[in-house]
C-alpha cells in the first residue's frame, strides 16, 4: 500500500506541473506577441522606407527632367523671314502668309532671298546662308568650339554648313560627323551634358531642309533652317519636354499635364507654336491654344524641321514677351514631343 502511494504524484507535484504549464503558456504567448509586434514594426519601417525610396526616385526623375538648357544665340530662316523682327511679326499675325509658287507641278513656299531653284543646291545654299546670317546678326562675344554638335538634315548640307563656318567663324571648329538630331532624346542628352559642363561650354544645334514640291500634296513644300548655341545660361531656358506615343495608349492631356509639372507651371502658357497634328482637340479642352499660333500657312511642309522650327519660335516669343511659350511637334522617336520655353527670370 505504501509503495502504491509513493508511485502516485503528490498534490505538490501537480501544482508544480500546472505552474510550469501556465508559465510556459505565458512565455509562448509573450513570445508570439513580441514576434507580432516586431513584424508590425518591421512592416511599418519597410513601408516608410519604401515610401522614402519612391519619393527619392521621383525627386531624382524630376531633377533629371527639369535640368535646364539655356538658348544663348540663335537664328531662324524660312519663307517669311530671317530676323527676329520678322518672326515676331509672324507670331503677332501682322504679316500675311507668303504667296505659293508653282514648282514642278506642285505648290511651294520659298524664301525670296534665295535665287537657286534646284532642291539640293538650294539646301546647300540655305545651309551656307545660315552661317553667314548668324555671323552678321550675332553678338560680339568670344566663341569656342562646342562640346557637341547636333544636326537635322543631310550630310551634304552639313558639309556645306561646316565649310562655311570654317570660312566665316574660324574659331568654331566643327566635327566632320555631327550627332543626328533626335528630338526630345537629344534635348535630354544636351541637358545632361550641360549640367556637368563648365559654365562657358556650349552645344551647337542646327538643321536645314528644303522639301521638294509634289503634285497633289496636301501642304505646299516648304523650307527651314535653324541654328542655336545652347549653354547653361541664356536669355531663355527650356527643359527636355515630354513625349507622347499614340501606340502606348497614354492620353495626350496626361503628357501635357506632365509638361506643366516639369516646368512648375500651374496652367498652360498663353502661346504655343505648333503645326497641325491629329488629335490635338483634347489639348484645347484642357486650356492649350492650338489655333492662334499654328504655323502651317507660314511654312508649308518642312519635313523633319518642324520640331526645331517651333522650338525656335517659342524661344523668340519667350525672350521678347518675357512669358512662357509652348511648342509641339512630331518627334523622330515618338508620335509627338511637347515642351515649354521660359524667359530667364522664370527659370526653374
Language-model segment annotations:
Residues 3-189, 195, 200-202, 209-348:
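Conserved "HGTGT" condensation-loop signature of ketosynthase/thiolase-family condensing enzymes
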Amino acid at each position: 500500500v505504501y509503495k502504491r502511494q509513493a508511485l502516485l504524484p503528490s498534490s505538490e507535484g501537480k501544482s508544480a506541473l500546472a505552474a510550469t504549464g501556465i508559465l510556459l503558456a505565458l512565455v509562448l504567448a509573450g513570445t508570439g506577441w513580441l514576434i507580432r509586434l516586431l513584424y508590425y514594426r518591421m512592416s511599418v519601417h519597410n513601408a516608410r522606407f519604401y515610401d522614402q525610396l519612391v519619393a527619392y526616385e521621383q525627386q531624382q526623375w524630376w531633377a533629371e527632367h527639369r535640368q535646364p538648357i539655356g538658348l544663348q544665340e540663335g537664328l531662324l530662316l524660312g519663307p517669311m523671314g530671317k530676323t527676329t523682327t520678322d518672326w515676331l511679326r509672324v507670331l503677332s499675325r501682322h504679316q500675311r502668309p507668303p504667296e505659293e509658287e508653282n514648282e514642278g507641278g506642285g505648290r511651294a513656299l520659298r524664301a525670296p532671298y534665295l535665287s537657286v531653284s534646284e532642291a539640293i543646291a538650294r539646301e546647300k545654299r540655305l545651309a551656307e546662308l545660315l552661317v553667314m546670317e548668324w555671323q552678321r546678326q550675332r553678338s560680339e562675344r568670344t566663341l569656342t568650339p562646342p562640346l557637341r554638335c547636333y544636326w537635322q538634315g543631310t550630310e551634304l548640307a552639313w558639309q556645306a554648313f561646316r565649310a562655311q563656318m570654317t570660312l566665316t567663324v574660324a574659331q568654331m571648329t566643327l566635327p566632320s560627323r555631327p550627332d543626328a538630331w533626335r528630338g526630345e532624346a537629344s534635348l535630354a542628352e544636351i541637358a545632361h551634358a550641360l549640367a556637368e559642363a563648365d559654365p562657358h561650354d556650349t552645344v551647337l544645334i542646327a538643321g536645314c531642309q528644303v522639301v521638294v514640291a509634289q503634285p497633289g500634296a496636301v501642304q505646299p513644300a516648304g523650307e527651314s533652317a535653324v541654328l542655336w548655341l545652347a549653354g547653361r545660361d541664356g536669355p531663355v531656358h527650356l527643359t527636355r519636354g515630354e513625349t507622347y506615343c499614340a501606340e502606348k495608349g497614354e492620353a495626350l492631356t496626361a503628357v501635357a499635364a506632365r509638361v506643366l509639372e516639369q516646368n512648375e507651371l500651374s496652367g498652360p502658357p498663353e502661346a504655343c507654336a505648333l503645326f497641325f497634328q491629329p488629335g490635338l482637340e483634347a489639348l484645347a479642352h484642357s486650356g492649350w491654344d492650338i489655333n492662334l499660333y499654328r504655323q502651317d500657312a507660314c511654312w508649308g511642309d518642312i519635313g523633319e524641321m518642324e520640331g526645331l522650327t517651333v522650338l525656335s519660335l517659342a524661344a523668340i516669343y519667350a525672350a521678347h514677351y518675357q512669358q512662357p511659350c509652348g511648342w509641339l511637334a512630331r518627334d523622330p522617336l515618338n508620335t509627338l514631343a511637347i515642351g515649354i520655353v521660359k524667359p530667364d527670370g522664370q527659370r526653374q
